[in-house]
Amino acid sequence: VNPIRRVWWIIIPAVVVIIIALLSAQTVSQYYVRSRLDPAVELQKAIDNMAGQSSYRFSLHSGFTVDERREVISSVEGEKEMGNTHIKGEMVNTPVDLYYLDQTIYNYDSFSKKWLVIDSGTTSSEDLLISELNPLSNFRFQTIDAVEKVQFEEIDGADCLLVKCHPTVESQLMESLWKDFEYLIWIDYKHSTIPKAHLTAANKSSNNTTLEITVGFSDFGKKMEIKAPTLSSNSN
């Protein structure tokens, strides 16, 4: 047998064994880390960290189901940096392109093809009670009942802990209209962020009406320049 070939016969199995050993060690390490995660602790850490994020991009899709008939409330994508927000998409079957900067709302009117400028009279987008402008408002809880670990899933390349809980929400508007809130929250436990969440709730006056909101978050802490639109320009 060729000596070089003999050497390769020795090297290749050895390399395979090393690779298998490394993969096994990685799997064992991941299993160990996962097994030590407390879902309630990880959820609170992620909520606190999300509240302190200076910037992020997001998507929000909301709707309700009445007797198995699906109605869309909104489908928007947006970005936030400090107190400034920009969203674009559709709300109640109407195109929306909206900025909130320095207490001023810039809303593109698709009918007149003009930007409308409105003094909101508020110091924060949170005061506008529009979930699409402040998606984190959906994660303000008064109390959280038992947090259940569901499984692990990969979201955008991140290993995420999926948890389920039934909190009491802080939003008086939400509480006045809906009940039996159930949240599914994907936690990137390595960075204490929430890349995805889904909530459902039942209507207080109609048991056959269910609310659903799905939110996605990304690009945490990235620099974004959200500037007022040029009023003579069209919506981009």
Spell out what each predicted region is:
Residues 35, 108-175:
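Flexible, processing/modification-adjacent segments and terminal tails
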Residues 2-84, 222-236:
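N-terminal leader/targeting segments and the immediate start of mature chains
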Residues 42-44, 146-151, 182:
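Short structured motifs
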Residues 75-132:
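An acidic-aromatic
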